Structure formats: structure tokens, C-alpha cells
A protein has these predicted regions:
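Glycine-rich, acidic/polar active-site loops that bind/position phosphate-bearing ligands
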Residues: 1-436
Length: 436
């Protein structure tokens, strides 16, 4: 159901809303917001809300700093962990320059442009993300430690699983915010958890993922815990992935239903993702820590596909009807979902447009090194991934030059900081663990 600005204003008046958070992401996926009083919301809808873009990572230079937020009424939700009297609403925003032109660094806008391109090709793309996270204890000052909340394992129950009530609270909050939880369970690592929610349109799924991450962080904090979405917060435990599930539809039909021929549109779509997988990696896996996850605990390392096989980069899960889809297993939760979902879809659409043939499936366990002979591997480090993406004609055609340059510049700084740090673990804690 579409909402108008007037719908939101009526809701604010009827439901004791006092504050409205106008939320957006920097180009690296970190959520930001500015709060306005509910009485100022009509002005925000009509004139936008100006802010200093030079203070947001990857946005603007000081000499050209003004940007404008425009709230999207369709993203309205009430934050259930905030007070019930004087309630707090949140909406995601689009971003423009003061003259009304789209801002090139708005990654949400990039995803919207890819969705429009798919629509022009007669396609609808649905997306669902599976996001894992860790829960850690905090010290007497409330600062995060590296001590996991529990020592449970995959699908364990209490008393080994001590996060059951946290996941329950997360699921109820998600439901209150319009997300539909599907599954929740303890994951493989000590203190590791997963909560899955229903797929949706590409843009809504990216919005939902940001909502999910902020919800997990807030509820963990309320319970005296710290939630980490870092890909590999403990080297002796499983990494956290963010598997991206995609289905494409033409004339109401899911193209992943039934057998997928190498020369079918679904086959071309998968082929496009495989062809551009290495170029996408610095976006799917954007920090140095991301690369310690590859090749273990069901995290892929090679460019390949198969049905069901969890050692593959792309797999086709066993499903029927509307749930037939592909699953890309390389992304991790530190990524910007707008960029990643947009680039995944763009790669698949490129495969369709160029009629790329689908390679033969690889039906081997690629966690055994000998089984991977002859296969192309994903980049082994962030620096290698940046080099590949920076030389990619595909990436250059996809992303606005200012966004791309800022992104690579920031990642190169991350590489230098990590590689030159006297204590890489201490550097990682300050620059990644505490922020992701």
C-alpha cells in the first residue's frame, strides 16, 4: 500500500508522534539520521531538510557541502523500543543537491535506478537477505567485550542458547515495524544468531535490512549486550554472512521455477552474476576482515554455481513456486545493501542483455582444496578486490564517478591502516568491530 505525505501527517496527529527521524546511509552503508519535531514534518515534505554533506563519510567536500533530505512516506515506521508517549517515527530519505538534482552519492538512488532499468526490460526483481550477527557481553562501563553471550551451536536450545529471549524481542519489534520474521535460531558460532524475514521488492529489502540491523543493535543494547555485524569477529568461530536471495519475474512468472536452461533468461541472469563476481567483491565484502571469512564455515571462495551445494558462490536452494530463487553466498553484513543489491541485479541484467551462457554446475565440495582445481577464486584481500573493481568497465558504467572514487579512496585507507597497524587486532577493534 502506497502512503502519501498527507497520510503520514494524519498518522502523526492521531498517534502522539513527537519526533521524526529522517534516516539515510553514507556510501559505506552506515545508517545516519537527523530528528525533527513532528510539527516540522510538513516543511520537510514540502521543502526538504538541508544538512552538511561534508560531515558524512564519502559524501561532499567542505566547499560544496549542502545536501537535502526528502522523506519517503512509504518507509514510515514507529520505533517500538522508544517511549510509547511522545512516540518516535522513522522514515528513510532520498537525497538531492539544493537545486533539486539527484545526489550522485545516494546509494539508495542507485538501487532505484537499477530497479527502473529492470522494469524497462519487463522484469520484476524480488530480494531477501539472510543476515547473521554475534551477541557479546559488555563490561561494567557498558563497553563491548569479545566475550560471546553464550557457547551454543547451530540450532541449539536453552540453556546452551541464551539468546532466545533476545531473538524473540527482535522478532516482535520487527513485526511491529512491518517486517515479517520467518525464522530465528542460534547459529554455529558462540553467541552467533540469525533472524530471517520475508523477501520483498529490491528497494524495500535494502530498507528492511537497515531497519533489521538498527533494531538488533538497539535491542541488544537495551539488554546490556553488544551486537556485532562484523564478518569475522572471532577467528576461531564461524563468520557472519549476508546471503542475498534473488528471484526475477516476467509477466507474473518466476523465471527460476523448473529447470533452468543455459540459454534461458534465468540462466543468463546467473551467468551475469558469475561473470562479474570478482568485480563485485569489494562492495559485497568491503573491509579487510571480510576476507578472513572466505573458504570456511560454508563461506564460498570460488566462482561457481550449483543446486543446493553450500560450498558454491551461487546456489539454487530447494524450493517450489514463488520461493524459487538464486542465493549469492559471498556478501557479508558490513556491506552497503543498496549498492550490493543494486550491483547484483545489474550484473544479472547484464547477463540477460548480453545473453551470457550459463556455465556447467560444479557439483563438488569446494571446501576441499583439491576439488577446486581449475576454478577462478574470489579476491583474497580487500586490496586485490579494489584493484579488480577499479579496472572494471562494468563497475565504471554502473556507478557515478564521484561515488566510485570516494568508495575506493576510503577502502584504500582501510587497507593502509590495517596493513601498517602495529597491532592489527587493536586497529580492527577501533575501526570495524565497534562500528559495524
Amino acid at each position: 500500500m502506497k502512503h502519501t505525505a498527507q497520510d503520514i501527517l494524519n498518522y502523526v496527529e492521531d498517534n502522539d508522534v513527537k519526533f521524526v527521524r529522517l534516516a539515510f546511509c553514507d556510501i559505506f552503508g552506515n545508517q545516519k539520521n537527523i530528528s525533527v519535531f513532528a510539527g516540522d514534518l510538513p516543511y520537510a515534505f514540502e521543502q526538504g531538510v538541508c544538512f552538511d554533506g561534508s560531515s558524512i563519510a564519502g559524501f561532499m567536500n567542505t566547499e560544496e557541502s549542502d545536501l537535502v533530505l526528502w522523506p519517503d512516506p512509504d518507509t514510515m515506521t514507529i520505533l517500538p523500543w522508544r517511549p510509547t508517549e511522545g512516540r518516535v517515527m522513522r522514515m528513510y530519505c532520498d537525497i538531492t543537491l539544493p537545486n533539486g538534482r539527484p545526489f550522485a552519492g545516494n546509494s539508495r538512488g542507485y538501487l532505484q535506478s537499477v530497479v527502473k532499468r529492470a522494469k524497462a526490460m519487463g522484469l520484476r526483481c524480488d530480494v531477501g537477505c539472510e543476515c547473521e550477527f554475534y551477541l557479546f557481553q559488555t563490561d561494567e562501563h557498558g563497553n563491548p567485550t569479545r566475550i560471546p553471550m553464550d557457547h551454543g551451536g547451530y540450532f541449539d536450545i536453552a540453556p546452551l542458547d541464551k539468546a532466545e529471549n533476545i531473538r524473540r524481542e527482535i522478532c516482535f519489534a520487527m513485526e511491529d515495524m512491518g517486517l515479517r520474521p520467518q525464522h530465528s535460531h542460534h547459529e554455529s558460532g558462540f553467541g552467533q544468531n540469525e533472524v530471517d524475514f520475508m523477501y520483498s521488492t529490491a528497494l524495500k529489502s535494502a530498507d528492511n535490512l537497515n531497519t533489521f540491523k538498527s533494531t538488533v543493535k538497539a535491542i541488544a543494547d537495551r539488554n546490556g549486550l553488544f551486537a556485532s555485524f562484523m564478518p569475522k569477529p572471532m577467528q576461531d568461530q564461524a563468520g557472519s554472512g549476508m546471503h542475498v536471495n534473488v528471484s526475477i519475474h516476467r509477466d507474473g512468472k518466476n523465471l527460476f521455477q523448473g529447470d533452468i536452461a543455459p540459454d534461458s533468461e534465468a540462466g543468463h541472469f546467473i551467468a551475469g552474476i558469475l561473470a562479474h563476481a570478482r568485480e563485485l567483491t569489494c562492495f559485497c565484502n568491503p573491509i579487510p576482515n571480510s576476507y578472513t571469512r572466505f573458504g570456511s564455515c560454508e563461506a564460498p571462495k570460488y566462482v561457481s554455481w550449483s543446486r543446493q551445494n553450500r560450498s558454491q558462490l551461487v546456489r539454487l536452494p530447494s524450493a517450489t513456486g514463488e520461493f524459487c530463487r538464486l542465493e549469492l553466498r559471498s556478501p557479508d553484513p558490513s556491506c552497503n545493501p543498496y549498492l550490493v543489491i543494486g550491483l547484483i541485479l545489474a550484473a544479472g541484467l547484464d547477463g540477460i542483455e548480453k545473453e551470457m551462457p550459463l556455465p556447467a554446475p560444479v557439483n563438488r565440495n569446494l571446501f576441499h582444496k583439491s576439488a577446486a582445481e581449475g576454478l577462478e577464486s574470489l579476491p583474497e584481500s580487500l586490496r586485490e578486490a579494489i584493484t579488480i573493481a577499479a579496472q572494471s568497465d562494468f563497475i565504471a558504467k554502473q556507478l557515478p564517478v564521484p561515488l566510485m572514487n570516494k568508495y575506493f579512496e576510503y577502502q584504500t585507507q582501510l587497507c593502509h591502516g590495517y596493513e601498517s597497524a602495529p597491532d592489527p587486532q587493536a586497529w580492527e577493534r577501533e575501526n570495524c568491530f565497534l562500528k559495524i
